[in-house]
Amino acid sequence: MLRAPALKLPSLGALINLNFRAPARRSAGLVCINLWPDRVDVVHAVSAGRARPEIHRCDYYRRIGAEAAILKRLRKDLQLDRHRCTLLLRTGDYQIIQVEAPNVLPDEMKNAVRWRIRDMLDFPVDDAMVDVAAIPGTEGAAGRPAQLFAVAARNQVIAAAIKPFNDADIPLEVIDIPEFAQRNVARCLEPEGRGVALLSLDDRGGLLTVTCGGELYQHRRIDVTMASLRGAGPEQIESDELQLESEGPYERLALELQRSLDHFDRLFPQVAVAKLVLAPIYGANTLRDYLANRLDLPVELLNLAAVMDFADIVELHDPARQVQCLHAIGAALRVEAAE
């Protein structure tokens, strides 16, 4: 989403020397390198020109030592300098805001959006990088002006994220965010001419995206964690229907999803959402059955093996590993045509 070469802004250039050197020979696809406190995930995917996306690598490395030292070892072992590379910003490191598209020329759009969102940010816009993505189907819809997503992140946050890669001589091509990474996964799940809602959950909360035609139409953060669902469980089963506390996390999640989907239907009546897909989590079958009884559309469990090729990566057949790497996989599936 945020293109690395565009980071050569005066405000950021004073903080860090960006060092992007095109490798002599590039491998196909994109590599996402995701740094966590205890591990490093590396995913290499090739999607352009393939009938089904191919996952060539989905590795886990224990994080020992400084970030730059780890990345230097990975660059050497995996020849990362011969790949196009990307990283994901963490939730909380950026803001994504839906705004009315300014009526300006395309090359003036980002500056106009910076001015428009200046009072919506939690930090000064002069200290931020800003990128934009159009929301399809909003041009003149119901008499409303076109809408777009504005993504903003502090220059200091971007600088800190890039620095270990720069120190390790790993060429970053783009910086992405989970909303658009999840869109890339959802693109593989869409029935022809229809949209799909995809819900991922982890111990930081939930992320719902609605996509159609490979484009992101709506996103929403949901304050229900995987841990809270694990700790709840069904209270009882009557007539093959799960009955849970109305104030519990299951019910809160169902209500948030229904409100989000109803809101989407009002905004985009021209887009038919075919189904809700749940990313793999603990107790996914229970959650699927619960939501299927409360939502007005089919609910399915995500199975990446049905839409991607990764036969040689045994670990990725484990649903727990799929959800652990879901957004890294999505970031590696990014194609320029989607932007």
Regions found by a protein language model. Name each.
Residues 1-339:
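Hydrophobic/aromatic-enriched cytosolic interaction surfaces used to assemble or bind macromolecules
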